[in-house]
Structures are given as C-alpha cells and as structure tokens.
Amino acid sequence: MRHYEIIFLVHPDQSEQVGGMVERYTKLIEEDGGKIHRLEDWGRRQLAYAINNVHKAHYVMLNVECSGKALAELEDNFRYNDAVIRNLIIRRDEAVTEQSEMLKAEENRSERRERRDRPDNTDGSNENDSDSDNNADE
C-alpha cells in the first residue's frame, strides 16, 4: 500500500455535508485495509480565484495509506460528487502524521489574537520599563 496526501474542496453551500463525506471516504479506505494517518478540516476559506463563480470553499486534507483500488474508487467519488469542486491527490514517500503548516499558522494566529485581546499583561513585563531604564543612565 502506498501513502497519499488528499485535499478536496467542497462547495460552500454543502459545508454541512462535509462530515458525512469525510466519514464515507474514510470508511471506503479502511474497509479496503488502508489507514488514515491524518485528517484535518481547514474549514471555509477564500479561494485564490473563482471556480464556477464560487469564491469560497470548505477545505479538507487527508493523509492516507491505501491500495490503488481504493484510491481509484475515491477519485470516482470525487469526480461524480457535484459538491466536490476540486481535489488533489499527491503520492507521498511515507506517512505524514504531524500537524500541517496551515493548522500551525492558524493556531499561531489565534494565540496572538488571544494575547492581544487580553486586558492585562500576564507575562510580567511592562512596556514602559525599558524606556525608564534607558533614561536612568542619562
């Protein structure tokens, strides 16, 4: 069995069906003896360019280990499902299980937002302290 990274984009009007689609696709892979190494739901995001007058899509990424038969069946499911507006399947040399750069960046962004929105400064530093230290030497 080979390793693959699969990304598919779902029409934004069908976002509520994403959970069922992912469940169906993972079941298809696992019934054939494959494994899901990583599953990430990136949510609705702006597209770089419009696809059939659609400007947003729901992104899902899977890292799987599966047979060629299961992959062909998955590709057929993507092709005949009108809700899937784009898909990309890349062969990988090994299983990838760590978090993707997309999710890492999103977590960093949310952490920065939380720190910025916090009313008190909990790290113990005071922005004005460095200025007063510099002025004390003069």
Swiss-Prot record:
Region Disordered, annotated ranges: 97-138
Entry GO terms, CC: cytosolic small ribosomal subunit
Keyword vocabulary terms for this entry: Ribonucleoprotein, Ribosomal protein, RNA-binding, rRNA-binding
Stretches that traverse the bilayer: none
GO biological process per UniProt: translation
Keyword Ribonucleoprotein among UniProt keywords: yes
GO MF term (any one): structural constituent of ribosome
Source superkingdom: Bacteria
Signal sequence segment: none
Acidic residues: bias regions: 126-138
UniProt cross-references to Pfam families, sorted A to Z: Ribosomal_S6 (PF01250)
Regions of compositional bias (Basic and acidic residues) in chain numbering: 97-121
Listed NCBIfam families: S6
Family: Belongs to the bacterial ribosomal protein bS6 family.
Task of the protein: Binds together with bS18 to 16S ribosomal RNA.
HAMAP family named among the record's database cross-references: Ribosomal_bS6
Protein name: Small ribosomal subunit protein bS6
Native organism: Stutzerimonas stutzeri (strain A1501) (Pseudomonas stutzeri)
